[in-house]
Regions:
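Cleavable N-terminal export/targeting peptides
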Residues: 1-32
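Transmembrane beta-barrel domains of outer membrane proteins
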Residues: 26, 70-76, 138-140, 208-212, ...
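Outer-membrane beta-barrel channels and translocator barrels
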Residues: 30, 74-80, 144, 214-216
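Hydrophobic, lipid-facing positions within transmembrane beta-strands of outer-membrane proteins
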Residues: 35, 65-71, 131-137, 203-207, ...
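Transmembrane beta-barrel strands of outer-membrane/channel proteins
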Residues: 37-45, 87-93, 151-157, 221-225, ...
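Extracellular/periplasm-exposed beta-strand and loop segments of Gram-negative cell-envelope proteins
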Residues: 45-64, 94-131, 158-200, 228-246
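Repeated loop/turn-to-beta-strand initiation elements of outer-membrane beta-barrel proteins
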Residues: 81-85, 146-149, 215-221
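Outer-membrane beta-barrel "beta-signal"
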Residues: 211-217, 243-255
Length: 255
């Protein structure tokens, strides 16, 4: 993965040098350029890779209303205008609500204004609602006058955050799987909030396609995968990593 990342950076560096040379001639922003704006909604979530053994059943999933808005520019670098480099900026939400039945699920909750850690068995509800400012950089290939494919990397900065929820209908063993038993029943809940443990910077990969309805309007699907986890490396209150994996569906306007 590191070699692939370095290869992409090297390719983009060579392209940037070529762009700079052309910019000296005053043609960079007018020659072989394409500009567009896009809007989308997203379906997905912050999820582990595979289902951990602690999660026995997902009883509810709500993707919520998650929207994004992007502006990007494509520079065609081949003479036939089939290959290009695209740079964009977008603001996007990533979120979901879930309910799951778990067993021996390591977590940290707040009870009577005190934090307690341990292994919980019962029901866990989670509410995630985060906003990012993202810069995607992609290689674009024009398959036909109506179809384009693209793929590349993105870097995101977290600007608004929420990762919270509660546990109920079960019990927690403090510190170890055989520790002191704390019971949550008859409507008793214990909250948790890991918002401040979310990673500020995230990066990942994206793959997408665009279909041109006409000269200006486009439809597109796009898959985003967060390569690094959503939590800081020192975060230990969940025993497995969570990654942002989302499918974006939307429309755009090409100028």
């Amino acid at each position: 993965m590191k070699k692939i990342f370095l290869a992409v950076l090297a390719t983009l560096g060579i392209s940037s040098f070529a762009f700079a040379q052309e910019n000296e001639n005053g043609n960079f922003f007018t020659r072989d350029m394409e500009y567009q704006v896009k809007a989308n909604f997203s379906i997905g979530g912050s999820t582990p890779l595979g289902i951990p053994r602690e999660i026995r059943k997902i009883t509810h999933y709500n993707p919520t209303l998650v929207l994004g808005l992007e502006a990007d520019a494509t520079k065609w670098v081949s003479n036939d205008k089939k290959w290009g480099i695209r740079v964009g900026i977008r603001t996007e939400g990533k979120g979901m609500k879930t309910e799951a039945v778990v067993k021996s699920y390591f977590t940290e909750v707040i009870q009577n204004d005190e934090k307690i850690k341990g292994y919980f068995t019962g029901t866990v509800e989670t509410d995630i609602k985060n906003t990012y400012v993202t810069m995607p950089v992609s290689v674009v290939y024009k398959v036909s006058p109506r179809w384009k494919l693209y793929g590349g990397l993105y870097a995101s900065i977290l600007v608004d955050k929420n990762f919270s929820g509660y546990v109920s209908d079960g019990y927690l063993r403090q510190d170890t799987p055989i520790g002191t038993k704390v019971v949550f029943e008859n409507g008793t809940k214990a909250n948790y909030n890991f918002s401040n443990d979310l990673r500020l910077f995230q990066w990942g990969g994206q793959l997408g396609a665009e279909w041109h309805l006409n000269k200006h309007f486009i439809l597109f699907p796009e898959l985003n995968y967060g390569i690094n986890g959503i939590f800081k490396s020192e975060f230990k209150s969940i025993s497995f990593a969570l990654h942002n994996i989302y499918l974006n569906l939307g429309f755009g306007y090409k100028f």
